[in-house]
Amino acid sequence: GGISIIDAKPFITDIEKLPADITENNQVNGKVLIYHTHTNEAYLKTEQERIQQLYASRTNDSEYTVVKTGNTLTDALEKYGISVDHDTSNNEENGYNRAYATSMSNITSMTKENGKYSLYIDLHRDSYTKNVDSTVTIDGVKVAKVMFVVGTQAPDYKNNLALAEKMMELLNEIHPQLCERVLEVDTNYNQNISDHALLIEVGDNAVTAEEASRAAEYVAQALAELHGVMW
């Protein structure tokens, strides 16, 4: 996360090339892999914190990080009959600036062990942008906004881009501002792992963990609609 223009993070130099032997087990396993390169990205605990402009940063308490959102997304996808592996490894354990290298190592190991996943999701949260609403209201409750980031250096990035754009379309049928945008960036974000790879920013550090979880339910709904069609 944290890849908004105003709050760029030093992510480009640490991204690893895809190991040559990853195709040792090239059978597609039909599962989704959800993981978190920036595992400790945190959300607010309460709406009162937002009112007080106490924006979240990082925490090891997974009840208030992107891991919690990943748990919600996992549960929601499984209700649609989609099998999921949710990797909650702390990819920041070797240092924040090595997070992409660490996550690539982890997802490569899981791919070698389990076969190629049908879809890889790196789930983040963004950084708050001043004077921009972080939530939308659906059925009377606040839901975190969503965005997608596509690395244009990934060999088959156009497939990832098409998937992200279709996801945006479906989410914005639910609410016209639920998905803010699809951002293309000149790097790969480890999306060279597959031509079915998404980096999803669910909310930012001005939303609560609960609001992010609500968004994850809608992300699952859109993913389920595209299951067997685009991935």
Where are the regions a protein language model picked out?
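Solvent-exposed loop/turn segments at secondary-structure junctions
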Residues: 39-42, 90-94, 125-130, 153-156, ...
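Active-site-adjacent mobile loop/cap segments within catalytic or ligand-binding domains
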Residues: 181-231
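Active-site-adjacent substrate-binding region
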Residues: 156-183
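A short, glycine/acidic-enriched catalytic loop
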Residues: 53-56, 129-155, 164
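Soluble periplasmic/extracytoplasmic beta-strand elements of cell-envelope proteins
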Residues: 31-36, 83-85, 119-124, 145-149, ...
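Catalytic-core regions of hydrolytic enzymes
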Residues: 58-133
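Non-catalytic propeptide/linker segments at domain boundaries
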Residues: 1-37, 42-46
